């Protein structure tokens, strides 16, 4: 299927000599995944409960998991505000992978995102996988998300990240709906193009390993676990950026790194980053627009 052929080569040993604004070695994009209130659950009438959790307790799929519901609520009640305070401390721009229903249920958070100048990327109306959807269902999910976010924030949505798994039709649907890019892959340290309907479509890769969700995968425990991993990734990319500038994404979840014992990992990372010159901390939409203007 066009646009879904696997590419094992990419830029290979000759990545493009990217000229980020200001001659930066690295473009750093911090991403808040704002999903709380849009996840699966019996309270929403879903046939299954949300299984992405810090602890999974025995319960029937159609019964409410009140413990997990409260963990998600922590993210929207407390965690998101803590993350924003840390970002403000370091004057760090941020992108929000936003679920429409989540923003609808917490307008104060949506207003704060707008106030701080964060850019919005579509992440579904509900925080649900597209796997198993037909094209009509998937297109409806995309349109509902876009309409909701644009109505609440006033921002035109040009980018998208699907809760895995996407389908073979996802990227084509996004292109047909007028999106400029998606972040539905993890295969490079730089943006690249895929051909959809005979035209170039931009992909701005994301990261699931420079990502706090690893706490919920039992791969991290302390704040230093997060700090040391993302610091080492940054240091590697910054060093490589002396001759071949790179891009780095860091994924944040309000219910995860918004916890007090973990938030220090984000604080330490930003403190580390601010010691370096030649770092473009920016919005995802700005990276996409730059790439389209310069290399499209």
Q: Model-flagged regions — what are they?
A:
Residues 208-229:
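Binuclear metal-dependent hydrolase catalytic cores centered on His/Asp/Glu-rich metal-binding motifs
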Residues 196-214:
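A structural motif
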């Amino acid at each position: 299927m066009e646009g879904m052929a696997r590419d094992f080569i990419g830029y290979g040993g000759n990545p493009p000599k990217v000229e980020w604004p200001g001659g930066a070695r690295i473009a750093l994009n911090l991403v808040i995944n704002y999903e709380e209130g849009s996840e699966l659950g019996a309270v929403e009438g879903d046939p299954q409960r949300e299984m992405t959790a810090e602890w999974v307790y025995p319960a029937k799929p159609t019964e409410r998991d009140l413990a997990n519901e409260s963990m998600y609520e922590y993210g929207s009640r407390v965690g998101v505000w803590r993350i924003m305070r840390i970002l403000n401390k370091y004057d760090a721009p941020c992108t929000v992978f936003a679920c429409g229903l989540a923003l609808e249920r917490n307008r104060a958070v949506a207003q704060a995102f707008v106030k701080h100048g964060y850019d919005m990327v579509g992440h579904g109306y509900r925080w649900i996988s597209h796997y198993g959807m037909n094209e009509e269902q998937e297109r409806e999910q995309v349109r509902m998300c876009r309409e909701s976010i644009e109505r609440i924030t006033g921002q035109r949505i040009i980018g998208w990240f699907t809760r895995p798994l996407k389908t073979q039709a996802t990227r084509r649907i996004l292109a047909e709906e007028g999106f400029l890019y998606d972040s539905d892959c993890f295969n490079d340290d730089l943006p690249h193009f895929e051909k959809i309907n005979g035209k170039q479509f931009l992909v701005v890769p994301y990261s699931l390993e420079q990502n706090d969700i690893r706490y919920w995968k039992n791969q991290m425990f302390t704040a230093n676990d997060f700090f040391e991993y993302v610091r080492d990734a940054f240091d590697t990319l910054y060093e490589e950026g002396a001759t071949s500038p790179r891009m780095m994404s860091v994924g944040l979840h309000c219910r995860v790194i918004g916890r007090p014992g973990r938030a220090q990992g984000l604080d330490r990372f930003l403190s580390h980053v601010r010691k370096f010159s030649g770092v473009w901390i920016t919005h995802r939409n700005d990276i996409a627009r730059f790439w389209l203007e310069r290399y499209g």
